[in-house]
Amino acid sequence: GSIALKGNTLSSDNITIEPEKRTISLAFQENSLFPHYTVKKNILLGAERNEIKKDKSINFEELINLLDISHILNKFPHEISAGEAQRASLARSLITKPDLLLLDEPLSNVDQSFKEEIQEKLKKILKNSKITTIIVTHDSYEAFYLGSKCGIILNQELKQFDDPYNLSLIHI
């Protein structure tokens, strides 16, 4: 398949966005933090490497407070929990305020007791920043809660794509 974004097309065969215009971030099911950097350095790394201007990025302090990770900024990945690492990875992907955010099971490692709170905060961040986001998840509640549009894929085929409240799981 392909994705059209701001007049540019991305596909597995062709990416036609010039490097200086690429603002795509991603976060995986497994955190991808660099073990030799602190959490703070991991989060800021994307913005620094891409020379993102402050007016283009999401406010660092606001982001770490929303994701409740201010207490782990000076720690290394091996010193924090899986849920904290997942939230730090999410912060790193959001800090650049990308045009497109790709998330693969972004909250799978977050404790259930904390998951709904993070979903609420993530929804707020995505809504306020107007980031186009594609989330792959097995958690239908998460998809319906976070998504303005949801697709249901079964046997590698898109069965439905609509507003979450219009989808029917019965006929699948």
Question: Residue spans of the language-model regions?
Answer:
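A short, proline-enriched helix->beta-strand linker immediately N-terminal to the Walker B motif
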Residues: 95-99
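Conserved ABC ATPase signature
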Residues: 76-80, 84-86
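Conserved ABC ATPase "signature" region
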Residues: 55-72, 124
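ABC ATPase NBD coupling module
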Residues: 9-25, 49
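Conserved small/polar residues in nucleotide/adenosyl-binding loops
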Residues: 170-172
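Catalytic Walker B motif of ABC-type/P-loop ATPase nucleotide-binding domains
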Residues: 101-105
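ABC-type ATPase nucleotide-binding domains, specifically the catalytic core motifs of the NBD
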Residues: 13-14, 37-57, 66
